[in-house]
């Protein structure tokens, strides 16, 4: 994002949606560096929202929960776990009792970047199936 906002054409607004993690809000044992980095993304989002609003720039963040991606599938496969086992292991990691799909993470990003969210800036949207309130 460095330098991108200031170079925006004056007649066009820009929208940034940063991807953090629900663990930026909760933290976990043994994951301090990852969780702190994701919390830093939230601080950066709020700061940039303040700094860039005069340029017509909106900056928001989403905090996804566990998302069943190819990355997690390949890590599970390398550990000898089936997809069913992976899904079972994460059933308790959200109120909804399952992993998110990549599409369930993409839609809120698209919405925050759309004109329908034109009055939202500096916000954090938890897309975590309720994990952040557990």
Task: Give a label for each model feature.
Residues 54, 66-93:
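A glycine/serine/threonine-rich, flexible loop-to-helix segment
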Residues 21:
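Residue(s) in the substrate-gating loop at a strand-loop-helix junction
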């Amino acid at each position: 994002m460095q330098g991108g906002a200031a170079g925006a054409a004056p007649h066009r607004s820009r929208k940034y949606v940063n991807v953090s993690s629900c663990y930026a809000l909760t933290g976990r044992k043994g994951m301090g560096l990852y969780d702190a980095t994701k919390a830093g993304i939230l601080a950066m989002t709020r700061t940039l929202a303040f700094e860039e609003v005069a340029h017509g720039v909106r900056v928001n963040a989403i905090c996804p929960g566990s998302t069943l991606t190819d990355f997690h599938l390949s890590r599970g496969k390398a550990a000898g776990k089936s997809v069913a086992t992976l899904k079972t292991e994460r059933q308790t990691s959200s109120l909804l009792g399952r992993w998110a799909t990549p599409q369930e993470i993409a839609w809120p990003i698209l919405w925050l970047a759309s004109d329908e969210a034109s009055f939202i800036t500096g916000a954090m949207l938890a897309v975590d199936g309720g994990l952040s309130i557990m």
